[in-house]
């Protein structure tokens, strides 16, 4: 079990070695109650309050330059990722908040390790970065479409697990 836990932290360990900054993963509890209360008016009020709080926190992040936040939204097409970004982060200052929508890798990105483009876009000090989709798709899509060899697949799994 301990060895598996260490492998799961591979990305964070790599980032720590590269930058000297310790990262920690915050996981959503799948057993938690959904955000929706069943009332559109109450849900809108909750999103408004959350957006206001995020805007204030982002201002502190930007001014303090000690902390950073990476938000990764993963879901199928039409699952609400763009709407979540607009609704929750749309009212924050453009200073220090960036959204990255991952598309097919460019030829320059393909010339590097598959996580290279991910590492290039993680937040800097004082920044909030939102990933619209995750690096897991750079494993899943090529495997499903047989674009990479079984050895490349194994290597990618090792890097993200």
Predicted regions mapped to residue ranges:
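Glycine-rich phosphate-binding loop of ATP-dependent small-molecule kinases
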Residues: 4-161
């Amino acid at each position: 079990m301990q060895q598996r836990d260490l492998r799961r932290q591979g990305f964070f360990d790599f980032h720590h070695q590269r930058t000297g900054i310790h990262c920690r993963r915050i996981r959503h509890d799948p057993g938690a109650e959904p955000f929706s209360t069943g009332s559109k008016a109450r849900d809108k009020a909750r999103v408004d309050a959350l957006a206001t709080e995020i805007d204030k926190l982002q201002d502190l992040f930007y001014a303090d330059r000690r902390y950073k936040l990476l938000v990764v939204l993963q879901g199928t097409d039409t699952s609400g990722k763009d709407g979540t970004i607009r609704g929750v982060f749309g009212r924050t200052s453009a200073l220090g908040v960036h959204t990255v929508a991952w598309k097919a890798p460019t030829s320059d990105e393909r010339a590097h390790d598959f996580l290279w483009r991910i590492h290039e876009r993680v937040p800097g000090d004082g920044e909030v970065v939102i990933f619209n989709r995750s690096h897991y798709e750079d494993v899943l899509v090529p495997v499903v479409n047989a674009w990479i060899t079984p050895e490349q697949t194994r290597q990618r799994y090792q890097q993200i697990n």
